[in-house]
Amino acid sequence: MLYGMIGRPTHCLLLRDENVRSTRLIPNFMVVLCALILTGAVGGENPRASAPPMRVVGYLASWGVNTKGTSIANLPAKHLTHVFYAFAEIAPDGSVTLGNRCVDVGACGKSASLPRVAGGNFHELRRLKARYPHLRLTISVGGWAGSARFSDAALTDASRRKFAGSAIDLFIRRWPALFDGIDIDWEFPVEGGLKGNVERPEDKQNFTLLLAELRRELDAQGKRDNRHYELTIAASARPAEIANLEVDRITPLLDFINVMTYDYHTGGSIAHFNAPLYAAPHDPTPEMTIDSTMRVFRNANVPAEKLLVGIPFFSRAYGGVANVNGGFLQAAPTPPKNWHDSDGDWRRLSVTRLRDPHYKRYWEATARVPWLYDASTGNWISYDDPESVRAKMDYVRGQGFGGVVIWELGGDDGQLMRAIAGEN
């Protein structure tokens, strides 16, 4: 946006839009005047820096490629700014390694060495980047099932150096110009992760130190390569787990934060929403909403443009739910016996339960999310559809957040991504 005492002159906007090609069409005095306005030399407020473009980050689960109808060549790259490849793992010695050597780079068999020219998914991702030069590719380390060794990796100066150095050696130096950054998905420091994860009270401080080491090494490599490498994290949406981050100290180290604003009621005993935008009337947990989560980060002085709101392309289901109020907030003793991940994403849901006459669609106007309920079985499903995604996008734009992050790209048939892009 351009601001000054003479408003927004059409010629200045033309100069900016058409760049140097237009200058020969504009009188010299107008070029000078535009330059003065753009530099703040003409009276009025100083010009405000334009906001960065909205980021649209999509996680790509390695195990879903070519198994769920997802191919890398057909990813909706024109609508994405970033693809986050999930996941790299932490080896027993604390170094970062591939999650699946065969799938990731085509190094199949126990004796296969890592190729200098990557095959597998990495090869396909390089081809995708060549077709879409704007697209940035990030390797994500950890995840829900891969966070057991983070606490040990972050524990000492030596372990942090080993973690950071090995990540950069493998994903930045070995295959140049493939990855543009590193994402840390530690679920979760201190407590709250998968049973069996190593957890320590000092994880809170050590996570900051681990990110600082990564930032230092990425910047050093970026200086050698004459470019910037991004560092991001995936952060919990739950207030208790956000409290286990030194938010004020990690924010300056990060390019942005992917807030996992979903799974709010996983493991709960009542039928509740996976990713409500706001609290529904009579909601006993009003703090478990997207808006409440984002307020926690904003109240910690995280710039809005560094925060990305999570949008799930998957559903959560409950079973044995009583037929009262369409099942919402009713006791949910068991999950549906036939429920599993591949059947619960939007891609499958849109052609199964949504077409099943036993399921009725409901809409909660305050929370801005739908649900499905089968009164004959008591099965209750919370999910996102194009209508709720559009509501989330309106919220993101209205609050000035930096964009959205999707888990995960293989769960869509195109409808949800078009809603994100404003095409439906």
Regions of interest found by a model, annotated:
Residues 48-172, 202, 331, 338-341, ...:
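Glycan-recognition patch characteristic of GH18 chitinases/ENGases
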Residues 156-182, 213, 242-253:
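An active-site-proximal structural segment forming one wall of the substrate-binding cleft
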Residues 57-58, 93-117, 189-349:
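Substrate-binding surface in catalytic domains of secreted glycosidases
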Residues 357-424:
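Extracellular low-complexity, Gly/Ser/Thr-rich intrinsically disordered linkers
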Residues 37-51:
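Bacterial Sec-dependent signal peptides at the C-terminal "C-region" and cleavage site
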